[in-house]
Amino acid sequence: MTPPPDRPRRERPTARTPQRSARPPRRKPLDPARRAAFDVLQAVRERDAYPNLLLPVLLRERGISGRDAAFATELTYGSSRVRGLLDAVIGSAANREPETINPVLLDLLRLGTYQLLRTRVDAHAAVSTTVEQAGIEFDSSRAGFVNAVLRTISTRDEQSWVDELAPDRSVDPVGHAAFVRAHPRWVAQSFVDALGASAGELDAALAADDDRPQVHLAARPGVLTADELAGAVNGDVGRFSPYAVYLPSGDPAQIAAVRDGHALVQDEGSQLVARALTLAPLADDQGRWLDLCAGPGGKTALLAAIAVGSGARVTAVEPAEHRADLVVQNTSGLPVDVLQADGRSTGLEPGFDRVLVDAPCTGLGALRRRPDSRWRRQPADIPALTRLQRELLASAIALTRPGGVVLYATCSPHLAETIGVVGDALRRHPVIALDTRPLFEPVADLGDGPYVQLWPHRHGTDAMFAAALLKLDT
């Protein structure tokens, strides 16, 4: 009889041969930078958190600094900013709609895909770290799915994926530009509509939303000049606003002039809007100025600082308690009265000389400052916002004396929020449009008027819109 084959003998453990655990080895979790980015993406999805607000807190709490902090910032802001493009690539590589993928897995895939397409991270490291985290969060099956998708993505560069997935430029030029620049198509279309005859600038306008915005400071009039502030912070005097200084680097919160209230952090476009109201031609200015949508108080502070020189006093209206408190803090020592109230029903006595309506809006003009905001807003948001804007502008006009000026402003170029709202006011209320362009001198390239539309790619500011209206005597 043929003897049975030898079976491997199991050795008893000895002191020299320790027995191995039957449990699989614990996978190494994500490094601190990737972990922070992953946690922020989950918080955005689950709690509607804002990446630009949450990430600095996490970095500080976890002691992440230097290169790790820079990497976490790049992953978080970058993957948030180009989410639409990443999802299109992920969907193609996975052969399924991104919406059908587990949301946590999709967050991981976005981080991995961003590293593969937009960074110099080694492809193997980008894939392996993401797969390992998928195994920790789920199981080997899900980790295998992540591995397969990322390996497919890693076989091609971004341009190759864009060439395959972007709409045909000759058929849908707006859709093509929106895909390439990672914007929702409706946002790109709103830029085209606002650019009008300059629609050929669409790509430049979209690209500017991906540029890191330079920090702008405003020197407080009557206290500090722009030249003095620039010298103190080693910055450059602004191109347009007489108060503006461009900060090349560093944390503005650490600047002594900012801490002391002698300067504030404010985009140059916002400075120009506040200044424009004070430059509007007005007979017999009695010094009653109103900021109807004041929170958090940046424009109010600049208005009030200018008001000091003319003997005017500013009333600031803000409905939200915490934002009204910020107005109080930001205008300390200035001639400002803060009223917590809805701007549509303030209870104030009419007769204001100059009124600013910096209305709540979609914020499409400041997409470069908030990495995920282009994906937060939807076209369905527009009707409610424009209704609020019309009501606020109507209230402002009612509070303005005959011969007084209202300056309506938004940080959005969307025509429904700009000329649509202003046009409605011109039809319904006793106002006429002034040529707003002279109020923004020395800014050039402002078009045919009578309104002003700033653009990041032209002026280096947020895309602020402004319209000056003169109230008639009825």
Range-by-range predicted roles:
Residues M1-T474:
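S-adenosylmethionine
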